[in-house]
Amino acid sequence: MVVMARLSRPERPDLVFEEEDLPYEEEIMRNQFSVKCWLRYIEFKQGAPKPRLNQLYERALKLLPCSYKLWYRYLKARRAQVKHRCVTDPAYEDVNNCHERAFVFMHKMPRLWLDYCQFLMDQGRVTHTRRTFDRALRALPITQHSRIWPLYLRFLRSHPLPETAVRGYRRFLKLSPESAEEYIEYLKSSDRLDEAAQRLATVVNDERFVSKAGKSNYQLWHELCDLISQNPDKVQSLNVDAIIRGGLTRFTDQLGKLWCSLADYYIRSGHFEKARDVYEEAIRTVMTVRDFTQVFDSYAQFEESMIAAKMETASELGREEEDDVDLELRLARFEQLISRRPLLLNSVLLRQNPHHVHEWHKRVALHQGRPREIINTYTEAVQTVDPFKATGKPHTLWVAFAKFYEDNGQLDDARVILEKATKVNFKQVDDLASVWCQCGELELRHENYDEALRLLRKATALPARRAEYFDGSEPVQNRVYKSLKVWSMLADLEESLGTFQSTKAVYDRILDLRIATPQIVINYAMFLEEHKYFEESFKAYERGISLFKWPNVSDIWSTYLTKFIARYGGRKLERARDLFEQALDGCPPKYAKTLYLLYAQLEEEWGLARHAMAVYERATRAVEPAQQYDMFNIYIKRAAEIYGVTHTRGIYQKAIEVLSDEHAREMCLRFADMECKLGEIDRARAIYSFCSQICDPRTTGAFWQTWKDFEVRHGNEDTIKEMLRIRRSVQATYNTQVNFMASQMLKVSGSATGTVSDLAPGQSGMDDMKLLEQRAEQLAAEAERDQPLRAQSKILFVRSDASREELAELAQQVNPEEIQLGEDEDEDEMDLEPNEVRLEQQSVPAAVFGSLKED
């Protein structure tokens, strides 16, 4: 039941409450200044009609006007009550008045100001809203202005009132100057580009400015250049030319874009000739190919657009294009620009490095057909290039300059150029030497032989002050007398044009200066030999040998010894031996083989056979390991030819001891084959037995097949058994090698035994050995399978004096100790039948005696 009551207080004659409100009313009467009591009461009355709820808020605020909680909830509730009403409804004005009343006490609360301003923005009352924002900024301390300004700026941007917004932004930038980019973007959007350019220029020049968008100073510069260059009619307060040129000095890595921006500014301003001047200045000053490409492409596009506009204008006026002189001029200008591109690009590269010799040569080639420009280019090049900073060979510029004059018939001018070149302080002696050689070649091409000799003799003359060839502190003019290039050319000219004595003097001088090469020494000796001065040529070889060490002296020794043997043969055998011993003393193993073979040939032809064998024996020790096998082959061949094959047994034995397993195996087979030919079956069998220790049956099946064939032909039951026993022993030896087993385990995949990685963690130490044992058992089983199967046919070895009856009886008996040969062995011995064995008498091979048989 609802009970309506009226309070007896005279100040509240209209206050009405229900029976459920009595407890809250009584509590309020006891604690009327308690915010919590009022809030509990208000929370209880949330479902009551809006006037009753508002009345309750008013009662509370009258007693507690400084309660932020009450005001915040009350204002929020009042705004919610009018949310779906028309903004012209009088209720909105009542809510606004409530906010104004609240600010009498709550003017320091930014949250209430923000809610009120947002409420006014929703009503669309622009002036009232702007003034309220201003009141909020005045009422709040400056530390809390940052909470008001974002909403204020959003309000300013939401209405097409640029002047109001500009004034607001200017005030905001005083508080937050780092937000200048936001203001600049607004100015651009509102088409106030002049002020935007001013603000952007200020930002760019402020070194302390940090972009909120993370833009670099160059990016801001680029925005400024684009802004002022693309809007010349709207940006009036800035000196665009000065700004962009200032950027050219600051941002040297982006010159192309800045130059294009400056030219674009003048193009949009209608100053086309000024824009063309900017382009020309740009392509003559940029330092990189990238910048040049940007500027040149923009320049060419500008000229094309000008020509297209001119042609369109002419067509509209009805004039013939052929009669338009201005159009012809523009076309000619555009063609000249395109034709100048390679030369302009070359200029860019030379501005990067004016000492780049190759680029100067390319520049000359670009002027092909224009002699005056070529001469000017060469002159500029030789004056610009510093030999100590040059990239390339600077002397080639002088030589090419002289060659240009020579090709055009101006021989005197060419001589003058080369003479000046000989006085240039080059960095390398070789440059000056090349110039002197070109001087000589110039005279030779025009058949001035005496002048050529005179020039080269002048170049090689001793200077007043001698200097070492590599002494960088001395000018190259004092060091060129030691240049081998000049001396070599002089020696060639003396051989062709001079006398024997003058040529000999030149070669002697080269040797005295110790600048000769092995080829120079050989040339000198050959020159003396051609003139029948044999001993002098040998002396030249000796002098050359004293100048060089191994391996450079190798060619000199080879030529010297060959010439000496060809000259004297066996007449000066002791001297030849001394020369060989001298050559071999200190000779590296790499070069010893040729000398030893030459030495042995000398002994074979003119000396003693035992001396030749001694030389071969020394050679097998002196050469490189890779050449020992070839050396032993030669040694064995020569020993067999001279002394007979029996003399090679010791050589074979030594070769087997020295050579690697692969080559030793081949030597053993050859050795055993030789013994077989000599009828020494036991010696051959011993060799096979020795060699078997280095022959793994799995990889050297050819050896075991050879031994098996040998035993089938020459052996008996016991020898074959011994061979098979040795084979099993060797195979077991190789099987038990841990390294081999490990490598085999890695190769086996998917086997039943598995791998170490398949084991459980913690068992690797014990199970590694288990796997090795399993693998060993597997390999042993394979070895058992590899053993020869029991033969179906029997090979019986019988005495040669057995009768046919005994042979037949033996053929029918089963031998309990018969040899188990494999199927392949059975096939090889199918032809052997237990018939009579015929013994043939063989003659001694002729190779046994060698060359001694002839004696």
From Swiss-Prot:
Transmembrane segments: none annotated. It is found in: Nucleus. SUPFAM superfamilies: TPR-like. The modification N6-acetyllysine is found at residue 420. GO terms for biological process: blastocyst development; cerebral cortex development; DNA-templated transcription; generation of catalytic spliceosome for first transesterification step; mRNA splicing, via spliceosome; transcription-coupled nucleotide-excision repair. Its main location: nucleus. HAT repeats lie at residues 15-47, 48-80, 90-122, 124-158, 160-192, 198-230, 235-268, 270-305, 369-407, 498-530, 532-566, 571-605, 643-677, 679-713. The modification Phosphoserine is found at residue 851. GO terms for cellular component: catalytic step 2 spliceosome; intracellular membrane-bounded organelle; membrane; nucleoplasm; nucleus; post-mRNA release spliceosomal complex; Prp19 complex; U2-type catalytic step 2 spliceosome. Residues 820-834 have a biased composition (Acidic residues). Residues 810-855 are annotated as: Disordered. Keywords: Acetylation, DNA damage, DNA repair, mRNA processing, mRNA splicing, Nucleus, Phosphoprotein, Repeat, Spliceosome, Transcription. SMART domains: HAT (SM00386), TPR (SM00028). The keyword DNA damage applies. Involved in pre-mRNA splicing as component of the spliceosome. Involved in transcription-coupled repair (TCR), transcription and pre-mRNA splicing. Associates with RNA polymerase II, the TCR-specific proteins CKN1/CSA and ERCC6/CSB, and XPA. Identified in the spliceosome C complex. Component of the XAB2 complex, a multimeric protein complex composed of XAB2, PRPF19, AQR, ZNF830, ISY1, and PPIE. Identified in a pentameric intron-binding (IB) complex composed of AQR, XAB2, ISY1, ZNF830 and PPIE that is incorporated into the spliceosome as a preassembled complex. The IB complex does not contain PRPF19. Belongs to the crooked-neck family. This is Pre-mRNA-splicing factor SYF1. It comes from Homo sapiens (Human). The lineage of its organism: Eukaryota, Metazoa, Chordata, Craniata, Vertebrata.
